[in-house]
């Protein structure tokens, strides 16, 4: 293995980590906007139909990524 190959892969991981972090921050911001909109309009915070849709989507994503999709969903729930 060449040092340049290792550096290239590490750089790719660093870029991926930055992208993941930015995407999660964007998702969190959108979630806060939804929470505020629901509060403003007097809409209950929990929509069981939407939550079921989200769970189904993450279950489908988990088929290809193992527990990663569920870990992301759980993180999003804890940090909303």
Regions found by a protein language model. Name each.
Residues 1-80:
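Domain-level signature for soluble enzymes in the chorismate/prephenate branch of the shikimate pathway
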């Amino acid at each position: 293995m060449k040092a340049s190959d290792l550096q290239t892969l590490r750089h790719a991981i660093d870029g991926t980590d930055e992208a993941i972090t930015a995407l999660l921050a964007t998702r969190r911001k959108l979630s806060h906007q939804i929470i505020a909109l629901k509060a403003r309009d007097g809409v209950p915070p929990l929509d069981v139909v939407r939550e079921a849709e989200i769970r189904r989507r993450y279950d489908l994503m988990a088929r290809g990524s193992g527990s990663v999709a569920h870990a992301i969903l759980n993180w999003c729930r804890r940090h909303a």
